[in-house]
Amino acid sequence: MNPYQNKNEYEIFNAPSNGFSKSNNYSRYPLANKPNQPLKNTNYKDWLNVCQDNQQYGNNAGNFASSETIVGVSAGIIVVGTMLGAFAAPVLAAGIISFGTLLPIFWQGSDPANVWQDLLNIGGRPIQEIDKNIINVLTSIVTPIKNQLDKYQEFFDKWEPARTHANAKAVHDLFTTLEPIIDKDLDMLKNNASYRIPTLPAYAQIATWHLNLLKHAATYYNIWLQNQGINPSTFNSSNYYQGYLKRKIQEYTDYCIQTYNAGLTMIRTNTNATWNMYNTYRLEMTLTVLDLIAIFPNYDPEKYPIGVKSELIREVYTNVNSDTFRTITELENGLTRNPTLFTWINQGRFYTRNSRDILDPYDIFSFTGNQMAFTHTNDDRNIIWGAVHGNIISQDTSKVFPFYRNKPIDKVEIVRHREYSDIIYEMIFFSNSSEVFRYSSNSTIENNYKRTDSYMIPKQTWKNEEYGHTLSYIKTDNYIFSVVRERRRVAFSWTHTSVDFQNTIDLDNITQIHALKALKVSSDSKIVKGPGHTGGDLVILKDSMDFRVRFLKNVSRQYQVRIRYATNAPKTTVFLTGIDTISVELPSTTSRQNPNATDLTYADFGYVTFPRTVPNKTFEGEDTLLMTLYGTPNHSYNIYIDKIEFIPITQSVLDYTEKQNIEKTQKIVNDLFVN
């Protein structure tokens, strides 16, 4: 017996949770066909039938993408993970990634065009119909570039250990031929209005290749010339390409954000769009574009002459189990968190209600809401319970489950009614394919009325490295839209596995600590939504913010401390306390009047370094340190803090700083002679 067979109001609801899913192997009303057919979610099995050679990108796509985009999204995750690892290499030329590492990600399987077609499908979600000619245009661009970059890498690998005149000439000549071609191709994609939005994920990948190539020139161009007996000149030197690289970082970052926002607006203003459509575009673009441009600043050799330990602290959402009968704005408010400090799940309380109909013989226990407990970064002592989410009544029962940091949740399965995706009976939480715990409503409904859906952002493995996401929060919509009270929309949010709980300060790399990884901020300070290109949200600093970092035990090292920030405030002073008290004056970084955080461009951010180093301290026992950044209470201007960076005073940094000072002095002397 179907305990809901008389509730005809439900028939207007769609069961599939993904607005873009093309799978239709099961009837919308399965009870009318084969009531005993098992209904394990088969979306990914469908994708395997559609995507050729998809297995190299992972075997568990869950409910987060469609067959038309999964290969492209997977490639994007791998590229970002690869770059995070490469930037952390503690060598002088950190951030120079071999094209032999980057390019094979995009050319795999029997039809390498799959990746580029999927990237177009991601970018084209806001558009009703994509010009089919675009894929031909795109492949005609990327294939020759790939061939030339392969050749360039071959020449570079031959030159590096044997820096002869001939080897230097070969790599130098190919660079000067290839670089303007890539620049011209990117301009063509940007300047064609019909190409901009659909090609954005592909554009971001090609732009990454261009920045990587320019980083080669910024580092090695003078050496190539010297190997050939040529003296560097104003427009023919490593210094020139360093400046050119910095301009391109800004150009590509701003273009990607502007184009992404244009696509997001198109979906949001489309009256036929659902929240899942909106969220799918946001999720896929985050994984293929926004995560990428968030680490573009690391290519700047002036700011990052050595390795950089970077993190992505943004939070992304898998699609909700039902998004009908509410607007995008309503569901955005009901399912996503307001900007907050970075949190780590500690416990979860799950609520259950018996919605038994007196005419039915079943106890229809189902999920009705949740409450999450969490800690902040490097703080296991203070457990904070958040708000209760869902429409809870006094008759509801609840049970608390622990979450373990050494067993991060990377997949959630929802067991729900086979027809109605928002009637939930169980949630099963997994870590590395093993069940950690299971919430159950203990409903007596028969199993043939149940269906299981998976929610995850699949892990990707590349060159023996694994890149993934872990569950960061659960939120149930408070809105009740039916006389039957057990229907619930629930959303899962995820964060990148690059995030370090302890804020460990690296010995040999520059360590970036996002402002959102603070323990707390003063009551007059505020967390605000970021502009999209910083890898997370921002802190408006007024009085103070506290954060805890971890230094390695029994090791002594001095550090310079630097802040990445944005403000139109006149000169203000900030203080940093911890080992010692140091201060620095913050110049304004933008002349714009009271800019909103979401509107901040790349150029609106600046850096300031404290003039005194954090002195040597050897930690023999307790290796964590509480530090506080003080601003100006009740300041009328906003100071947006993005990151606090710790720069180790190593010989590599000292050598690079001395080299930069010599080059700046030489430029001043040259300018004097010219004038």
Curated annotation (Swiss-Prot):
<dbReference type="GO" id="GO:0001907">
    <property type="term" value="P:symbiont-mediated killing of host cell"/>
</dbReference>
<protein>
    <recommendedName>
        <fullName>Pesticidal crystal protein Cry10Aa</fullName>
    </recommendedName>
</protein>
<dbReference type="Pfam" id="PF00555">
    <property type="entry name" value="Endotoxin_M"/>
</dbReference>
<dbReference type="InterPro" id="IPR036716">
    <property type="entry name" value="Pest_crys_N_sf"/>
</dbReference>
<keyword id="KW-0843">Virulence</keyword>
<keyword id="KW-0800">Toxin</keyword>
<dbReference type="InterPro" id="IPR008979">
    <property type="entry name" value="Galactose-bd-like_sf"/>
</dbReference>
<dbReference type="InterPro" id="IPR036399">
    <property type="entry name" value="Pest_cryst_cen_dom_sf"/>
</dbReference>
<dbReference type="InterPro" id="IPR005639">
    <property type="entry name" value="Pest_crys_dom_I"/>
</dbReference>
<dbReference type="InterPro" id="IPR001178">
    <property type="entry name" value="Pest_cryst_dom_II"/>
</dbReference>
<dbReference type="GO" id="GO:0005102">
    <property type="term" value="F:signaling receptor binding"/>
</dbReference>
<dbReference type="GO" id="GO:0090729">
    <property type="term" value="F:toxin activity"/>
</dbReference>
<comment type="similarity">
    <text>Belongs to the delta endotoxin family.</text>
</comment>
<dbReference type="Pfam" id="PF03945">
    <property type="entry name" value="Endotoxin_N"/>
</dbReference>
<keyword id="KW-0749">Sporulation</keyword>
<dbReference type="Pfam" id="PF03944">
    <property type="entry name" value="Endotoxin_C"/>
</dbReference>
<dbReference type="InterPro" id="IPR005638">
    <property type="entry name" value="Pest_crys_dom-III"/>
</dbReference>
<comment type="function">
    <text>Promotes colloidosmotic lysis by binding to the midgut epithelial cells of mosquitos. Active on Aedes aegypti.</text>
</comment>
<dbReference type="GO" id="GO:0030435">
    <property type="term" value="P:sporulation resulting in formation of a cellular spore"/>
</dbReference>
